[in-house]
Amino acid sequence: MHATVDRATVTAWAKQAQSTLEKAQTLCTNAQTSLHATSYQLTSHLPDLLEEANVLYESLKTQHELLAKISESLRRSIRDQLLNTLEKQQSTLLQPALNNLDDIVGHLSATIVPSFLIEKDEAENRTLADFISTDSINLLRRNIQIYTNNHEKIRQLLNNKLQDVILSPFHEIGSKKFNKTVKLYEEITPLQLKLKAITSNIAPLDSSNVVATLLKENAALENELVSILEMLTNHYDQCTQGVQILYSGGSQQVNLEILKNDAQELPDVLKELHTVYDIIVNNEARAQKFINAHSPSIEVVIATMKDQLSFYRSFKSKNIPEIMVLFTVCEEILMKSPIEDPGGPEQTPIEKFTDTVNQLVYHYTQFLNVFKSQYLRELHHEQFSYPRKFLSKLTNFLNDELYKMQIEEKERRRAWLTKYGDFIPKEFRLPGEYNQPVITQVVTEGLEDVQKEGADAERHITQEKELLELLRKMEELNRERRY
């Protein structure tokens, strides 16, 4: 031990070491607090914000895809499967059928029926349209008009509601805002990649990764703090030990030279510690600046996504049920047919109306065709042709075959009496001319028209001419329609 170093000097070194150690411990405590704050901000707070953003983003994507499918399904169900289907049926089925009905009724109205064709005598001619149920047709038309008017009102109501309640809100708020939110979320993706790189050994850290740089620097600074604190603690322990040895007069040797050198270096060590502390505090400020630069954008993304999810929840709980209830009610109204027929529930009212109209068209078309091509010809045959033929046959028979047979029979009987009559007693019934069958009167039915005379005969001839002229016109019309 050097004689120049007394107990007072060593004691002063010990006090200096204690004071320096206490200052160092305070600085290290503050530095550790700063390190923990920086670490929390960079490895906990910021990642938690990003994780919250990730969770919200995944939920947002799921809800958006779900509501997009529901919105499209509602659009197809309401517009394509119900409204457009009924509208197409109306334009391609019902309207052509009504046009055909108008056409055939027009033909019936244009087809004159001479008064002599009617059982009851009438002064004026009528048309075929006078013999169809126009009241029933008009009632059917009114029912169709009522249905189509209601269909148009419901179509406008459903279309407007679908647009206002589902399509427009989802497009403006759901889709447009969703796309903007996605862009905002994509802006924080580079930060996520930087944080992911810190916990991944897949690729070396980028020198531009501020978070990684700060954490790496702070880890080195923390090690330096520990090293300095250990050195100061060790120096203090040695000084304390030296004081104890000097005061106790023990024989244990103390390297006072080392203590002296260490004591002289304490201000520099403390200065170095302050420098490390300042760097740590500065890193905390840098970290806070980094957080302040990025947290607002992350929080904006989170707030935007929460707002978007709130819209989606409201959309699911209010808008969708509203349109579905309206759709169900309107569909029941549109599919309820005023016509009770065996068409079955699978047929729409428009299809049932169309079937009914087509049946009328078929019946009236047959009515017109039969009248033009069958009835007039058959009527002429039964009223004129056949009676004449029958009368001709009857006249020929009476005046030819039957008359000849009567003459032959009369001559035969006369010859027989001449030859055999004298041999038969007069008390016997003798054959002769007195009981020969003869026609004294011919009674016929259905030949009155062809047997008329005078004015009646002239009128009958006129009717036949009119009938033949009408038949000719009908046949010409049939040929024109064929060609």
Swiss-Prot record:
Signal peptide: none annotated. GO terms for molecular function: molecular adaptor activity; protein kinase activator activity. It is found in: Cytoplasm; Preautophagosomal structure membrane. Its main location: cytoplasm. InterPro entries: Atg17, ATG17-like_dom. It comes from the Eukaryota. Keywords: Autophagy, Coiled coil, Cytoplasm, Membrane. Residues 136-161, 206-235, 446-483 form a coiled coil. It is a peripheral membrane protein. One of its GO terms (cellular component) is Atg1/ULK1 kinase complex. GO terms for biological process: autophagosome assembly; autophagy of mitochondrion; piecemeal microautophagy of the nucleus. Belongs to the ATG17 family. PANTHER family: AUTOPHAGY-RELATED PROTEIN 17. Autophagy-specific protein that functions in response to autophagy-inducing signals as a scaffold to recruit other ATG proteins to organize pre-autophagosomal structure (PAS) formation. Modulates the timing and magnitude of the autophagy response, such as the size of the sequestering vesicles. Plays particularly a role in pexophagy and nucleophagy. This is Autophagy-related protein 17. It comes from Scheffersomyces stipitis (strain ATCC 58785 / CBS 6054 / NBRC 10063 / NRRL Y-11545).
